[in-house]
Amino acid sequence: MNNHVSPVDLSDHEPTVEERMAGVSDTTRSALVSTMLTPRFYTTDFEEMDKINVEPVRAEWDVLIAQMKSDPNRGHFKRNEQWDDIDIEGLPDDLREEFIDFLVSSLTSEFSGCVLYKEMKRRGKNQEICELFGYMSRDESRHAGFINDALKEFGIGVNMGFLAKAKKYTFFKPKFIYYATYLSEKIGYARYITIFRHLEKHPEQRFHPIFKWFREWCNDEFSHGEAFSLIIRSDKRLMEGMNRYWIKFFLLAVFATMYVRDHMRPAFHKGLGVDIDDYDMKVFRLTSEISRQCFPLVLDLDNPALHEGFRRMERINRKVMAADAKGGISGRIAKGFWSAAAAVNFVRMYVIPTKSNAIPATSRLQPVW
């Protein structure tokens, strides 16, 4: 059974982080790691978020909130006869390792949203925004719990209560939360639906039953993105002036992170029967198409220089990982050098011209892909 998780259930006195680290699982330790490529936990200026005024998007807002309130996916995140038994030890070693990494990363991302949205609801005073975050926290809680149930089946569940306390939190201004979370939700939809559609055509490559749940799952991600689109559109300043440069930054950062991270899981994608480059470009194009609802620009995904930038970033990341594994003074020097090279490459990618987009009169889209 899928148990929802709530970060506010963690208020009772418990042992310190140091006392508990000795007993945590490898998957929990993995979820605790914070790097440029791993999902992070965020906090923000909640008083600033209380100033959100949804009146400019009132009609679409009310429809979306009514949809979320109806909870169309209630009952979906429960196992049924479609959940096949699987012997994870029967998977090839590299596939098993990368699949577990995928699950832990996905759980961390979902739980990050759960924690952030729950905190927004708890600390906010804007009732309309608090209502929204309550629904989104509910959904992310289900997602994280469902993934953790799959991990627990193999005896490698993540201690999410411990994770909420021990994970480092990154402060983002509200507008950065809007841009980053909007993209996270929409690219999450694009990733999940692309995998789901592929496995519909090739069910023999579905090596775990959790993929059968991806369609309704990604519809939650889609509706969360719709909410952040409306928040962005509620204040024209978030789509104009210097904020255009921030939008470009987050588009590039999110896409580059996905590209590099996916190439760190070759066995996982081979197991699904997908080519990583083809898959990533499908996801990028779908995410770009969707993001036209609220972003005044999109990356030029047809520019060969951008593709080469992604490939170069992936090669540099391998150098960074090798230097980190080497350790010692020489390893630290090499890691610093290649990290600087990654920053230079990002700047080179950033100056590649984008394509302008005229924001449509209305925002709402439907998950029809």
What are these regions (language model features)?
Residues 2-369:
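Non-heme di-metal
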